[in-house]
Amino acid sequence: MKVAIVQEWLVTVGGSDKVVKAILDVFPDADIYTLVAKKDVCDELGIPWEKVHTSFIQKMPLGTKKHRAYLPLFPFAIEQFDLRGYDVVISSSHCVAKGILTKADQLHICYCHSPIRYCWDMYNEYLEESHLDKGIKSWLVRLMLHPIRQFDTIAGSRVDYYISNSDYVGQRIRKTYRRKATTIHPNIDISNFELCNDKQEYYLASSRLVAYKKIDTIIEAFNLMPDKKLVVIGGGPNLEAYRKLANANVTVMGYQPFDVLKDKMQHAKAFVFAADEDFGMIPIEAQSCGTPVIAYGHGGSLETVNGGKTGLFFNEQTPEAIVEAVNKFESMGSQPFAPADCRQWAEGFSEERFKREIKEFVEEKYEEFKKNGINID
């Protein structure tokens, strides 16, 4: 079984990139096809550079540094890869990778991190949060995204079997592409996080500091609770704005090296998470340290946090809802959720589990495909 892995880009070490590396570990003879890639990123991920095949965008001006500027070319570029020599194509997709062209005798399995959020269900939120909901720039962006949405509709039908990274994304795949998906939660490497029972008197929030992560909402909540400390870790375009927003009880540290993040995560009273994520890796990392999570009760958080056992939920992305949840958490005692229970829950998202489930799914579907062809749901 000759395998090709398709990914939109390999330019940062993110969650989808780690998924690609894990799939490559399962199928070590596979080749990787991606629009653009950086060698240092592949080296950090442990992906051999000689296995990586890039598109013409790689050679365009600033192709690897400003690859998103070439979004209108992505559909055309992904279709130029010639994968005729492979039996199975596995696309790791949150944009156009699922649009790869395959033949009738090739099996295409898509590990879908999300339908394109800024083209579908988050379209209006994206425009608003990017300040592109009004004016000439707004119409230019809308005109650019319209053909991307049309392509994505077509690309969605090119997949033989979908894997979703969460049940929540599976529902969105059903809504967007009218297709069923099997959920296999992504691989979370918790080997670098150790269980810690020594909790201190502060809460932690950490993510990239962009609007949809709702870090500002968390800061506003703790501004209303001057007797409670909040530490915020992460870099991003909103860093200075969030520092100005924070009161004296809130420390916005900005980007920090891993050792600092891990130390703060291990000793935090609880981790506060307000984003509406497709899956969300960092709450699992927090729980792997034995730190419970106070999370927005929607989307992937309902799968990554075991409500009542490793944390609790709030129902609205508002400061008031977070205040209510934190007060409820504190009313439950000094350590309402056992660190060992948090760690045990996090271990259920291990890399070994992911690799086993991916291997079983691909091999099972390939055997069915060889015998009976495609049975589209």
Provide a role label for each language-model segment.
Residues E240-K262:
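Nucleotide-activated donor-binding/catalytic signature segment of Leloir-type glycosyltransferases, i.e.
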